[in-house]
Amino acid sequence: MGAEVHYLNAIEALDQGDREKAASEAKSATVLDPEHLEAWGIYVEACLPPLGMQPTMAQAASALSAVKRIVALDPTRLDMWLRGGRLMADELGMLHDALYWWQDCREHLPDEVTPIVEMASILADMGEYAQAQQRLQSILDDNMDVGITQFRKINGLLQLVRVAATQEEREIFKPYEKHHNGWVAIRQKMRKPPVSESLIFLMTAVPILLLVVMLLGRYSAPSWSAVCLNTLVILIIILVMMRNAKRWFQLLNRPAFNLLRAMNFEAATGYTVIEEDIRTSVLYMYIMQRKPTSWQERMLKIIDNGQRLPNNWRLRLPDFSSHLEQAFHDSATVHEDLPASEEE
């Protein structure tokens, strides 16, 4: 059978919910025709479980391998760049690889905003706030085309990293620093799960609201204007307390966010930095249980391997200006290919 027949069989099997057969047929099609993009796309879909289910590490790795083949054949497929980035960062925890992935995407699609936003988000999660701010600021400086939804996300993320970047460098938790004060804070809070934002809101807002309602009911006149004024006062209090709850949530749960960053660091590097007493704590288990299945499987392999972070380890970020060099190279190549009459 030809590649096209296997491809059609894969589509039929996928429509029937037989993902194993679909993957087998799609793989057969790509063996016969390694440049069959549609077959590779079906293979990606067949490797991953149905919507709403989490993939295993093996499924995520197989899908990622196929995605890499697709973008190698057609670098303009932003949807596949996005899927590959999400598989790396969200499902497998490969944050450092995801940074290089998105910079590679930007070399091929320099006018797209998505790679910059994704890199900034990853850098912020890693605690590299200054780098994240530079990436986001470049969107505004270069006057890139941004949709309304993307602009809101960019603006919110930019405000977040601007505030975080104002911290002193020693205050920003870096998991690879053994004697950072963040480890002390983690040990102090590791016996309890993090406090939820809704609980903070209820504990702070409800007593104040009850007191205000009692006072308004006692001293306000029974009229429509009084009802409107009372409603406005209550609404303002709720909005203020919601904002305060978000701020207190960040402050009270800073040790939990630090531990999350340390766990992400281990997943990204493959080295262990968390001590055993922290790894068996309530806080660690709470965070671990809320990670994707594939992420947990990969982390367990890293823990079993038990390779400690080397003393000479250094964070190596991609060259964030490589897309400019690539654009210059492409421009020079086009110029060289022009006929002499056109050059004149």
Model-derived features: positions:
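Alpha-helical segment of the N-proximal tetratricopeptide repeat
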Residues: 1-32, 42, 48-56
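Residue-level recognition of tetratricopeptide repeat
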Residues: 2, 36, 77, 112, ...
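Charged, low-complexity cytosol-facing tails and large interhelical loops of integral membrane proteins
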Residues: 2-9, 33, 261-344
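TPR alpha-solenoid repeat register
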Residues: 5, 39, 80, 115, ...
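Structural signature of tandem alpha-helical TPR/SEL1-like repeats
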Residues: 16-25, 51-66, 92-104, 127-135
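Alpha-helical linker/edge segments of TPR/alpha-solenoid repeat scaffolds
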Residues: 50-57, 93-94, 129-134, 158-190
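Transmembrane alpha-helical hairpins and terminal membrane-anchor modules
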Residues: 192-265
